[in-house]
Amino acid sequence: MAYRKRGARREANLNNNDRMQEKNDEKQDSNKIQLSDKVLSKKEEIVTDSHEEVKITDEVKKSTKEESKQLLEVLKTKEEHQKEIQYEILQKTIPTFEPKETILKKLEDIKPELAKKQTKLFRIFEPKQLPIYRANGERELRNRWCWKLKKDTLPDGDYDVREYFLNLYDQVLTEMPDYLLLKDMAVENKNSRDAGKVVDSETASICDAIFQDEETEGAVRRFIAEMRQRVQADRNVVNYPSILHPIDYAFNEYFLQHQLVEPLNNDIIFNYIPERIRNDVNYILNMDRNLPSTARYIRPNLLQDRLNLHDNFESLWDTITTSNYILARSIVPDLKELVSTEAQIQKMSQDLQLEALTIQSETQFLTGINSQAANDCFKTLIAAMLSQRTMSLDFVTTNYMSLISGMWLLTVIPNDMFIRESLVACQLAIVNTIIYPAFGMQRMHYRNGDPQTPFQIAEQQIQNFQVANWLHFVNNNQFRQAVIDGVLNQVLNDNIRSGHVINQLMEALMQLSRQQFPTMPVDYKRSIQRGILLLSNRLGQLVDLTRLLAYNYETLMACITMNMQHVQTLTTEKLQLTSVTSLCMLIGNATVIPSPQTLFHYYNVNVNFHSNYNERINDAVAIITAANRLNLYQKKMKAIVEDFLKRLYIFDVSRVPDDQMYRLRDRLRLLPVEIRRLDIFNLILMNMDQIERASDKIAQGVIIAYRDMHLERDEMYGYVNIARNLDGFQQINLEELMRSGDYAQITNMLLNNQPVALVGALPFITDSSVISLIAKLDATVFAQIVKLRKVDTLKPILYKINSDSNDFYLVANYDWVPTSTTKVYKQVPQQFDFRNSMHMLTSNLTFTVYSDLLAFVSADTVEPINAVAFDNMRIMNEL
């Protein structure tokens, strides 16, 4: 504010002075009203006088500016200091946890594989009618049936064909059913005399087409009329007739023989419930004993730690633990009947005698205390331990109550659960604020990177037995690893589970409050003592809280199916010590335990994720092995790993670092292939030629000659340049030729007038116009290819001259015999033989597959007040 120069307007009249006085009074009143607002507001305002005729010298201006600068600096320093000190005072509400609904939904939407119902048989082939041509190229009236590919997408090029077979294998793995019930897919045979059924709609349509074909023998027609199912009710078995290519039959017969369904009975359901929940006296379980004999289930695949994602997969492990944390947060029960926040704060104020005090540090004890924060803290602690998520502590050193609450936290939660830096900071604050001042010891100067924590150093220096004993317990507070039901569990110390450790903590706190704090002022000592008093007044409730925390953690832990590996996570869950204070101060005497429905839901979600995880590992391992055995040297393994992660649903694959992707690939390579997947691959591998020859898209090679060769008659095409075998020709593998780039051998053979056969998958191109074929000299095409050494552009021309060609009669009339310097090598497709294609498939007549085994269990709990912990004493004893 600018200063007025004294005596500047003494000659002004009295009336004017009176008016000025009134204005000043009004200004002061308004200033008083706005003062509180201005102090609390964060806006920086420049306060100036009203515009009056006041003369100010340059010197006064300079001095005013300097004073203003100094004042601003003081205010800024004070403001920053206040921000630091009053952080928790100003923060009246603590941010609550917002569950990521998308991740939770992704986890809960993972269902067992049996949700995929098989409605038809697996088929690669289908029979098709092909024309027959006479010796002169004319088409006959009769047709022949041959097996062709249902979905003919075979590419050209040996490598691409092998890649096609890998994709086919992937498709089979995707469609491979866990169980087959033929009765569900059977359809009526239209040509049956007694309304019999065949196995599926495609078999029925094939039978219909063959029955209507004029070429079909009478015996075959009579057989089709007799085709029907054969039921053996006493054995719960039914046989259905089917028409399948031998390879398709091999696939479907394998699926039928290797179904994953197993008989379901009450013992299986009983053993499916986690043992600790079965044996927990707080849960009353009843089972429906009316299971039919046809009940079936699919045993979940719960193999452990095949990839060890906790080891060197930081990003993946962080995502898994985050998902588990979000799931656990959603099922931890809410605290009930907490102490009224207002009543508790009022009582604490009375204990602190705040009316008679103006010590700011003690008013901080009450900040941030609310029931929402208490509930939030309870859920965070249990969920973090269940998911093994690392926590970080948020606190202000000047709030002694937070630090005293932190002492309870460090007593009951193992050190491993906190990130090292946060644990050290909290322990150092407790040591330098409470423990060392109590005994008059100098501040601990902690060196960053010291292998020992502040509590470990303090344990060696403190002479007081009770305090040193408590420090020793905290320093050695680690999870105990135990394998229960085949799952690695992180178990709490028995002293924590029973709540006895709280007495140890209270003894240490009482010893600290009795100390003299010789180097500190009286107010400081009194503040610490009153903070300890507030906590010690709730000894019974703290014991109960510790028992309640341990019971809920262990009960929910029984529903975890994957090993609880403990590794520090990349990201942490923040925990504010004011929320710990809220929990300690507001916990009531109402027991909360998870409801049976919540437990079963948590267990089912864990089982489904774990089972899906193992099945996707099996798929990825099978695909990687298949790619290696098919010699797919260009195949990017990273793509297989990415696909594997996508099928687990919870990962953002694009954000996973490459080094972890390749490490994952290496781990997947070391795993053995699951037996069913291996057998299926061997079926494909043994029948690659059969599948390839059924394609109309590709030929198996080409014969190149220097001189023209006559076109030959073929029943399937007429006059064509097709060779049905390679006898008498020297063979060269086309893929190896293209990879080596050495074409000298071909050139020399052609110049010596020796035809050469290039063996490999080539496009099977047809052009029916003879005129256009004559215009294309394939000899010059191939000469150019050999000359330029671009065999990968090889596209042999198929001459096909028959009565379907536009120029058939032109050729016939002039008695012209066409020739070609190339012959396309094409294997003969397999002919359809009804007798060899008719197979009987056998399955159970009927059974019911149950996906949710726990639906048979009706469960209830005892009254929460009567709930007991592992020591057969009530969880909450304080009433």
Curated annotation (Swiss-Prot):
Pfam families: Rota_VP2. Coiled coil: none annotated. Sumoylated with SUMO1 and SUMO2. Sumoylation of viral proteins seems to have a positive role on viral replication. Residues 1-35 are annotated as: Disordered. Residues 393-413, 421-441 are annotated as: Hydrophobic. Residues 19-30 have a biased composition (Basic and acidic residues). Homodecamer; each decamer is made up of two conformers of VP2, called VP2A and VP2B. Interacts with a VP1-VP3 complex. Interacts with the intermediate capsid protein VP6. Interacts with NSP5. Interacts (via N-terminus) with NSP2. This is Inner capsid protein VP2. It comes from Rotavirus A (strain RVA/Human/United States/DS-1/1976/G2P1B[4]).
